[in-house]
């Protein structure tokens, strides 16, 4: 099997470049992937030498990096920024995917400007995989931050993209799509929800099963749920927080004393498995669906394990030719779709 080539923005993120490079080196050793580190060559070579001197890793020079406090549109005036250089590798066919833990708005802007949109998509969406009560069966939630304000047709397109990804990458034969709403009834919701419900119900390319209340999103009833980026970002951050709080509560309640130590030892084994299911680092990042290339946006606080998982996600998308499948969408986009907006994901 041909090894996937993954361009890694090594200068993006709170713990760049050290943690980014460590995660990338592990991925090159353990996955069917060749990583391309993009950033300051001297710093990257030094880190590679410290952690994996036996590996041959391609390093692509980039003279600048987009900081978290910079405006997303600064990518327009800084062509040699690390995220732009990484995107250019994908555009030139030298890489199959790009990942970045840097400024999410800049990542999206760079992807739009350099890779362009897939024909038929008005606005790309950020899709995050969240755990459900069914082991190994996450739900794809989109949009989680690229588009704060949406039109009904945007949500319809998110549903089609999410269904294609769920089917062709996650292996769900007939992905069940839900619309995040305040009630199960068709008549519930604001104007966006009501209009979107009508479009989703009448679209033959998706298996729309109805509204998804907040309590149902992680229930395993849905394979894909769609919403605007404002709601999705709140949902994503809340899910991450609940997982962390749940683990802390369990730790606090572990029995103490001699009798409790035996039980605690047994519980901790299960606790590790629970942590793996709830930890967002297990998925490593969110997919920017709708641009003409595979792009993974990792959390700004990502460390090596998250970067490794993000590269694994990118490899799966590349091996399953997700972009080829997304090109099934052939409706012409609207004229207003070329606008680069400021996403809310942090």
From Swiss-Prot:
What is the protein name for this chain? Phosphate acyltransferase
Subunit and partners: Homodimer. Probably interacts with PlsY.
NCBIfam families assigned to the protein according to its UniProt record, in alphabetical order: plsX
Q: Which gene encodes it?
A: plsX
Q: Which reactions are catalysed by this chain?
A: a fatty acyl-[ACP] + phosphate = an acyl phosphate + holo-[ACP]
Q: Which family does it belong to?
A: Belongs to the PlsX family.
What function is annotated for this protein? Catalyzes the reversible formation of acyl-phosphate (acyl-PO(4)) from acyl-[acyl-carrier-protein] (acyl-ACP). This enzyme utilizes acyl-ACP as fatty acyl donor, but not acyl-CoA.
Top EC category: transferase
Enzyme Commission code: 2.3.1.274
- Cystine pairs annotated here are none
């Amino acid at each position: 099997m041909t090894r996937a080539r993954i361009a890694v923005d090594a200068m993006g993120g709170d713990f760049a470049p050290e943690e980014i490079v460590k995660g990338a080196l592990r991925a090159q050793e353990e996955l069917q992937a060749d990583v391309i580190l993009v950033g300051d060559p001297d710093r990257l070579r030094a880190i590679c030498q410290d952690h994996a001197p036996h590996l041959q890793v391609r390093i692509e020079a980039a003279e600048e990096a987009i900081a978290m406090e910079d405006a997303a549109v600064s990518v327009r005036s800084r062509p040699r920024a690390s995220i732009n250089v990484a995107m250019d590798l994908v555009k030139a066919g030298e890489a199959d995917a790009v990942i970045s833990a840097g400024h999410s708005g800049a990542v999206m802007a760079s992807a739009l400007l350099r890779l362009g949109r897939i024909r038929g998509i008005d606005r790309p969406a950020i899709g995050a995989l969240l755990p459900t009560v069914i082991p190994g069966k996450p739900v794809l939630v989109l949009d989680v931050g690229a588009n704060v304000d949406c039109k009904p047709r945007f949500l319809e397109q998110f549903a089609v993209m999410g269904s294609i990804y769920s089917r062709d990458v996650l292996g769900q034969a007939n992905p069940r799509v839900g619309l995040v709403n305040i009630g199960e009834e068709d008549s519930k919701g604001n104007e966006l929800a009501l209009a979107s419900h009508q479009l989703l119900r009448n679209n033959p390319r998706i298996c729309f099963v109805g509204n998804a209340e907040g309590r149902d999103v992680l229930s395993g009833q849905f394979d894909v749920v769609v919403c605007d980026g404002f709601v999705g970002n709140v949902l994503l951050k809340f899910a991450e927080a609940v997982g962390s709080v749940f683990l802390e509560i369990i730790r606090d309640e572990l029995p103490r004393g001699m009798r409790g130590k035996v039980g605690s030892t047994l519980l901790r084994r299960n606790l590790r498995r629970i942590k793996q299911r709830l930890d967002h680092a297990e998925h490593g990042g969110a997919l920017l669906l709708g641009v003409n290339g595979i792009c993974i946006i990792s959390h700004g606080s990502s460390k090596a394990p998250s970067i490794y998982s993000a590269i694994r996600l990118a490899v799966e998308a590349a091996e399953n030719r997700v972009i080829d499948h997304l090109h099934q969408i052939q409706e012409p986009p609207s004229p207003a779709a070329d606008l680069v907006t400021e996403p809310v994901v942090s």
